[in-house]
Swiss-Prot record:
Protein's name in the database: UPF0735 ACT domain-containing protein CHY_1913
Family indicated by similarity: Belongs to the UPF0735 family.
Organism of origin: Carboxydothermus hydrogenoformans (strain ATCC BAA-161 / DSM 6008 / Z-2901)
Coiled-coil stretches noted in the UniProt entry, renumbered to this chain: none
Gene3D superfamilies named among the record's database cross-references: 3.30.70.260
Domain ACT stretches: 70-145
Length: 146
């Protein structure tokens, strides 16, 4: 049995047909009422190109949904910053499994949080982006998933 090998590649270096295949798949997942014909027409790719690549193109965070992810964050040493982060995760149905916070050094605390993502109401990518924009959060990084 052939084992499939995966690579993490920046989208801007991919050929147009593969990028557009990913766009069609995203469009179909967000708008299930669309047919493949309608989606490929909207994106501007042929049906044959879509069918050629569709089984080999996945968003990076797609494989992590329904799984456990581990985030590493740098938080400012101020009252309420960690609480706001945890409340935000809970607001979108992320289930916090573990929290490890180191003593603050230079006004920054390193925090590692493991989250079960199965019931989350936002994508992992959206969660990471929103957390990185929060006041008091200077770094957010996905360091593991299982």
């Amino acid at each position: 049995m052939k084992k499939t090998k995966f690579l993490l590649v920046a989208v801007d270096i991919l050929p147009e047909a593969i990028r557009k295949t990913a766009e069609v798949k995203e469009l179909l997942s967000k708008r299930p009422e669309l047919t493949v014909n309608e989606a490929v027409e909207k994106v501007g790719i042929s049906r044959s190109a879509f069918y050629k690549y569709k089984d080999g193109v996945f968003p990076f965070y797609h494989k992590a949904s329904g799984k456990i992810i581990t985030l590493a964050l740098n938080l400012e040493h101020r009252a309420g910053v960690l609480s706001k982060v945890l409340n935000f995760i809970a607001q979108y149905q992320g289930n916090v499994l573990t929290i490890n916070q180191n003593l603050p050094l230079g006004g920054i605390a390193n925090v590692t949080i493991s989250i079960e993502t199965e019931e989350m109401k936002v994508s992992i990518e959206e969660l990471l982006e929103a957390l990185s924009q929060m006041d008091g959060v200077s770094k957010v990084e996905l360091v593991g998933q299982s």
